[in-house]
Amino acid sequence: MSSGNIWKQLLEENSEQLDQSTTETYVVCCENEDSLNQFLQQCWQIDEGEKVTNLEPLGFFTKVVSRDEENLRLNVYYAKSPLDAQTLQFLGVFLRQMETSQIRWIFLLDWLLDDKRLWLRQLRNSWAALEEAQVAPFPGGAVVVVLNPSHVTQLERNTMVWNSRRLDLVHQTLRAACLNTGSALVTLDPNTAREDVMHICALLAGLPTSRPVAMLSLQSLFIPHGADSIGKICTIAPEFPVATVFDNDFVSSTFEAAIAPELTPGPRVPSDHPWLTEPTNPPSEATAWHFDLQGRLATLYRHLGDSNKAISVTQHRFHKPRSEDYAYEFELPSKHPTIRDLIRSAAADSPNDVADSIDGLMDGIVQRNVH
């Protein structure tokens, strides 16, 4: 066979790959390999041997999938979040021949990871890097995917940090960030129905979808570009500063200050696992925040026992519990009225005596477990 025929045969065999009309290009930004593999497996059903083992500095794989009885080649680049100038420079080597409108950007956030207080900063820094490199996605060209939202229930039940007001803050902040950048916002859980996953895949590709918009629950979001608005976001809290969520003041003094740092990130845990694993490294003062329930109860009972020994005193009253009694290690934000009255322990504002504080604390625990 002549060399000309060999090249002709090679071109024919790979003509599908060369046809740009049957190719879609994605850039996936994430913090963790396990998060990326979960996303790739659910959306594009990668095989075990195709799983990602390293995010740095840049990764790539290609896969042929079927959509509407047509074979489609996916070219997927992945990079560690947040994006920076160097990563975009590496990407530019591969994507410089493509129009910006041909590239779909995906930003993964994961409730199972201990970086939730940094979500907003990561999104802001990634977007700033894209704009500086003049490759920012066009409106509708990016999607923020929040993985494992069912873990929110575990956080509510097992921690003193994640109450409804903090969750509302995350809810409004993510929607505002996506509205301001022209991005879509969806949640993806391991138990998400396959039909819903297909709608998410269509949204990732920028295709129309018949799935109804869902924006009321933080655990079930499906908000295509153009479906949200400032008015809809502000139905949760009317004074929420939608337009300024990327400002330094809001990022550091409101969002990050309101969400307490968690223990040093350890291994990922499944959604049915207790909230925290044992940390691989001891937490520092800057990264640890906890509420020692057993220790607090022991202290209250000890004070109550001491007071009962003073028989000569007719009535025993104790000081009003202060915030430092509860070992808070961060200052609640106060710059925005909407955020100003984030949770304090109910006992910290109670005018009752210590015995009532114990009863109130135990009632709260029972109510949380019932719900």
UniProtKB/Swiss-Prot annotation:
<protein>
    <recommendedName>
        <fullName>Cytoplasmic dynein intermediate light chain DYN3</fullName>
    </recommendedName>
</protein>
<dbReference type="GO" id="GO:0005737">
    <property type="term" value="C:cytoplasm"/>
</dbReference>
<comment type="subunit">
    <text>The cytoplasmic dynein is composed of at least two heavy chains and a number of intermediate and light chains.</text>
</comment>
<comment type="similarity">
    <text>Belongs to the dynein light intermediate chain DYN3 family.</text>
</comment>
<dbReference type="GO" id="GO:0030286">
    <property type="term" value="C:dynein complex"/>
</dbReference>
<keyword id="KW-0243">Dynein</keyword>
<dbReference type="Pfam" id="PF05783">
    <property type="entry name" value="DLIC"/>
</dbReference>
<keyword id="KW-0493">Microtubule</keyword>
<dbReference type="GO" id="GO:0005874">
    <property type="term" value="C:microtubule"/>
</dbReference>
<keyword id="KW-0505">Motor protein</keyword>
<keyword id="KW-0206">Cytoskeleton</keyword>
<comment type="function">
    <text>Component of the cytoplasmic dynein which acts as a motor for the intracellular retrograde motility of vesicles and organelles along microtubules. May play an important role in the proper orientation of the mitotic spindle into the budding daughter cell yeast. Probably required for normal progression of the cell cycle.</text>
</comment>
<dbReference type="InterPro" id="IPR022780">
    <property type="entry name" value="Dynein_light_int_chain"/>
</dbReference>
<keyword id="KW-0963">Cytoplasm</keyword>
